[in-house]
Amino acid sequence: YYLRSLADGTLGYSYKKSAAVALLIRERLGYTLQITIPAVLLSAALGLSWGLVCGYRKNSMGDRLSTGSLIVLNAVPTFVIGLVLMLVFCFQSRLLPYAGLSSSGIVKGSPGYTLDRLRHLALPVLTLTLAALPNRYLLVRNMAAQETDEKYILYAKQRGLSGRTIRWSYLLRNIAQPFVNMLGMSVSVCVGGSVVIERIFSIGGMGSLLTEAVYTLDYPLMQGILFVTTCIMVLSILLCDLICVLIDPKRRREGAK
């Protein structure tokens, strides 16, 4: 029965909610992706640029402060980050809303709808970005710090090239593949991390749906969510492998042969 439901695309039937599993997931998946995709891109951009600078200037005061701070941040649970941000930006400064994805009275398609949605997404995206940033930064920083002792980097410095040129034209080439591979593996972690974030900020995404399925022992729904999450992880890893082929001349030549 389950294989037949996979073949016809329904992913089973949820008797607790009286609906096809695929329909329930389709309604919620978009909300989770609105949080996960910006967080993955932001944490990747920040981790890459910040890690390159600190790795190139290893053992400097800025490197020590940045690395120490992010090691501490890496030990902080995601829900603590979310609660602290909520306390600061929602209850003290009242700059951002603390729950949901839209304000009451805002109709989809109205002039203020997009801005209202962005304001509601700001804190969940920032929370997931801060939770994912330390791993990206530490990977890039450590690889860049090791590469700075290589002969080609020393030769580039002797030629009088600027630090910016060395970082983005030399260091980046050698750390790009491990970094891209790590991003592929971390997409599923971010999707899993959205479970906590969606509960904190009252967002009805995949994480909330999975929590409801666990509480009600809705096994078909749990199976469907895990299946979709696994497919997302596999597709992200495949996409990252294709990107690695494009950025690595050696692998491109091997593929051509």
Task: Give each language-model segment a name.
Residues K16-A20, G100-L101, I106, Q158, ...:
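Short capping/connector residues at structural and topological boundaries
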Residues L3, P77, D241:
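Residue-level signature of catalytic and energy-coupling elements of molecular machines
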Residues G68-V76, V80-L133:
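Membrane-water interface segments at transmembrane-helix boundaries in multipass membrane proteins
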Residues L29-G62, K108-K257:
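Alpha-helical transmembrane segments of integral membrane proteins
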Residues R26, T67, Y98, W168:
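Phosphate-coordinating loops and pocket residues in cytosolic domains that bind phosphorylated ligands
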Residues Y1-L48:
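An internal, D/E-rich "acidic patch" concept
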Residues T10, Q92-S93, L217, K250:
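A general structural signal marking secondary-structure boundaries and capping sites
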Residues L6-T10, L96, C190:
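A short secondary-structure junction motif
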